Regions:
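Local sequence-structure signature of Cys/Sec-based thiol-disulfide redox active-site neighborhoods
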Residues: 1-25
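ATP/adenylate-binding site constellation spanning eukaryotic-like Ser/Thr protein kinases
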Residues: 7, 47, 70
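Structural micro-motif
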Residues: 45-54
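Short polar/charged helix/loop
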Residues: 22, 37-41
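Non-globular targeting/processing and membrane-anchoring segments
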Residues: 9-11, 15-18, 43, 72-80
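Conserved beta-strand positions in the Rossmann-like core of class I SAM-dependent methyltransferases
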Residues: 28
Length: 80
C-alpha cells in the first residue's frame, strides 16, 4: 500500500497524485496539517517537506522518500 503524506497547496504533492493515478496505483493520502501523529511520523523518518511517500508491504515499510519522484513511483506500476 502506498501512502502520500501531503499538505495543501503543494505542487509536488499534486504531481505525485497525478502520477499515481496515471500509473493506476491505489494510494491513501494524509494531510499532515490536520494529523499531528502523521506529521510526527514523517519527521521521525527524517523528512521536513511534503510530499512524503511511504510504501508498505503488510505492516512493514518497504521504501520511503520525499518529493515528486516519478522514477520511484514507476517501480510500483501495476502490470496486466
Amino acid at each position: 500500500m502506498i501512502t502520500v503524506y501531503s499538505k495543501p497547496n503543494c505542487p509536488q504533492c499534486t504531481a505525485t497524485y497525478r502520477k499515481l493515478k496515471a500509473l493506476g496505483l491505489p494510494f491513501n493520502s494524509i494531510d499532515v496539517t490536520e494529523d499531528a501523529d502523521a506529521l510526527a511520523f514523517i519527521r521521525a523518518l527524517g523528512y521536513q517537506q511534503a510530499p512524503v511517500v511511504v510504501v508498505r508491504e503488510g505492516a512493514q515499510i518497504k521504501e520511503h522518500w520525499s518529493g515528486f519522484r516519478p522514477d520511484l513511483l514507476k517501480k510500483y506500476e501495476l502490470k496486466e
